[in-house]
Amino acid sequence: MSNVIENLGKLDRKVTLAIPKAEVEKEKQDRLVRLSKTVKMSGFRPGKVPMKMVEKQYGQQVEFEVRFDKAARKFFDITKEQDVKVAGQPKFEIKTEGVGEDEVAFDATFEVYPEVKLGDLTGAEVTRTKTEITDAEIDKTIDILRKQRVHYHVRGEAGEHGDGGGDVTAQNGDRVTLDFVGKIEGVEFAGGKAEDFPFVLGEGRMLPEFEAATLGLKVGESKSFPLSFPADYHGKDVAGKTAEFTVTLKKIEWAHLPEVNDAFAKSLGIADGNVDKMRADIRENLEREVKRRTHAMLKDQVMEALLKVSELDVPKALIEQDQERLVEMARRDLEQRGMPNAKDMPIPAEMFAQQAERRVKLGLILAEIVKAHGLEAKADQIKAEIEDFAKSYEDPKEVMRWYYGDQQRLAEMEAYVLENNVVNFVCDKAKVTDKSVSFEELTAEGNAQQA
């Protein structure tokens, strides 16, 4: 039956599309006429090729294109007229049985968007993480910043910061420079020898036995010791083997951390060097990081809750489309990491099947919530979000112009704000339990989730 949409399953549909042959032939001839004005053939000037030759050369291809174009247009008109929401792209197959002599026909199979049944959100359970930034967290951050600006002085040599104390042996925290050579069964191995090799004791850059042997040495002293490489050591040639190392210490430098004063504050971008302003700036940055992490964790909680309380079938076509998007994202990521030939790298779409299904499900659920409850991203919300984002940059006004100067970027921020509104809407309905954690616990939990 032509133009009647058949139900093949929960989401699967089929419609037969009949097109008069006369209509196809007319469109075919029109296209061939247009083509004849530009087509090039040996022995003829452009536009002077006889129509019979044009039709012989291109007629079959043009008719094929016309048939499918007509079928696609008719499919669009029928589904629009019957208010059918098509998910993904239809598949057209030429129909040969039961077709009139004066028509061509196609069977178009496709999927429709599902009905999304939103469950009772009051029964959803969500944990909301809260973290307060204390003075101790600010002090820890300052210590990290000081260590990033560490500079070293030769131990025992007097300077503006002193001589590093009376102990002239290598200690944890010192930067040492040494020569070393390692042998396995009396034979040197690749990577087992170096001269003027620097490293900081206690940072764990070297194997524990190597650092332990270096501790307590004085400049000019040598020491031999056995070192067992772990079985999972990255150097496969020596993994699981024991080597005999000899080290000779050539230089010890002690670490001098900058004092927390106006000069230190200025090095962090505080123009007048005010230490209190520096601490306030650090607090603001940490609070911004807390907001970002806690919001991401809350969003994950809300999304999991929505998946649990909602019922829907997922169109396979949408999953396949999202799989392809994820494949392209993976390729771009590899390309940005400098992977050679990333564009041509074969990445199986199947590896993203579960992720794509989850993303599509959530997209359908969120769209239903937005529609059912009239949620929207208001202009003042979008502006406030952009302003907050811009605060972390040197020139916030330039960041604002950057966003408002590109409709795609603005649309992405609008989608982000709308998603936030959904999260807030769900939290207003659900059972929310607040959980207080330290900044250290927050970062550890966030890093574990990313891993």
Swiss-Prot record:
Domain of life: Bacteria
GO biological process: 'de novo' cotranslational protein folding; cell division; chaperone-mediated protein folding; protein transport; protein unfolding
Record bears the keyword Cell cycle: yes
GO cellular component: cytoplasm
Catalysis: reaction(s): [protein]-peptidylproline (omega=180) = [protein]-peptidylproline (omega=0)
Leading EC class: isomerase
Keyword Transmembrane applies: no
PROSITE patterns attached to this UniProt entry: FKBP_PPIASE
Main location: cytoplasm
EC number assigned by the record: 5.2.1.8
Key words of the record: Cell cycle, Cell division, Chaperone, Cytoplasm, Isomerase, Rotamase
Domain PPIase FKBP-type: 173-258
MF GO annotations: peptidyl-prolyl cis-trans isomerase activity; protein folding chaperone; ribosome binding
Subcellular location: Cytoplasm
Matching NCBIfam families: tig (TIGR00115)
Function: Involved in protein export. Acts as a chaperone by maintaining the newly synthesized protein in an open conformation. Functions as a peptidyl-prolyl cis-trans isomerase.
Family listed: Belongs to the FKBP-type PPIase family. Tig subfamily.
UniProt domain comment: Consists of 3 domains; the N-terminus binds the ribosome, the middle domain has PPIase activity, while the C-terminus has intrinsic chaperone activity on its own.
Name this protein carries in UniProt: Trigger factor
Taxonomic source organism: Cupriavidus pinatubonensis (strain JMP 134 / LMG 1197)
